[in-house]
Amino acid sequence: MAYQIFAPRHILLLAVVTSAIGFSTPESVAAQCLAYEPKVVRLSGVIVSETHPGRPNYESIANGDEPETIWVLKLKKAICVIASDDINVEADNEKEIQLVLEADQYRRYRRLLGQRVDVSGKLFHSHTGHHHKTLLLKTNEIRKQPAP
């Protein structure tokens, strides 16, 4: 008889535990991750300018490599991206995205350096020496966030 009294509690506990475990399955984590191109994504953060070593060795400006200045979107919260092929591999816990812009976009958006912005574009994974961050975003548009 005691079994019948406690059975509903055990069922409730089992349901709660199963629910909690369900939220951390690989499928649910993947559902929270972003997709690579051709999917357009929207990210928020602050744009900063950084200088990195470029040609010929991509190692040291002091030792003769050309300086390469890039724009980076610094995210408040890290993101993950689901692998789509051999180049666009899985990425996890990324908080900095290198922005890829056309020359006219650098002129148009220069006033937004240091500002909180929303950026839309297509993600891809680094694959050359000019790619200084793990993730890059071929940028469609940048909009300044309204003041809080």
Where are these regions (language model features)?
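Bacterial N-terminal signal peptides that target proteins for export
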Residues: 1-14
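Short boundary/loop segments of OB/S1/cold-shock single-stranded nucleic-acid-binding domains
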Residues: 29-39
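Structural detector for short beta-strands of small beta-barrel domains
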Residues: 38-69, 79, 121
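OB-fold/S1-family single-stranded nucleic acid-binding modules
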Residues: 75, 127-148
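Beta-strand/loop nucleic-acid-binding surfaces
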Residues: 83-108
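Short nucleic-acid-contacting surface segments enriched for D/E, G, S/T with interspersed K/R
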Residues: 104-119
